[in-house]
């Protein structure tokens, strides 16, 4: 065997080992890192599936956005401000969120707020998907899937 062949084989094996396991076109799945959650301009809900609550948060005219700080999360999109805490460890996240304002909203927006809180107040398998912009996919053990896209920092 030539030295060129011997050098090519380890490089090929390294390339195969570094290939992501996510579906085609989906990019690489990373463990959730608090720095990645915090260092964005927020996270916008792009899809929700898996039940009635997921349907309610996708109602027309409603766009949920979350922002993370160290251990705290805030969200809005229906009508009210939502605040709470979260923990992230490896590929798991857990939320404890409540509605903190009681605005006079239309029924569909109130339902969306309640449904969003209901969807988030649990533990999820969490995946940070590349390439940029990052996407955060939360999959509940009960089957609901929420996907958020990171927004650029605004100065």
How would you label these PLM feature ranges?
Residues 18-155:
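Lipid interaction determinants
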Residues 8-17:
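Bacterial N-terminal signal peptides
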Residues 1-9:
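Bacterial N-terminal signal peptides that target proteins for export
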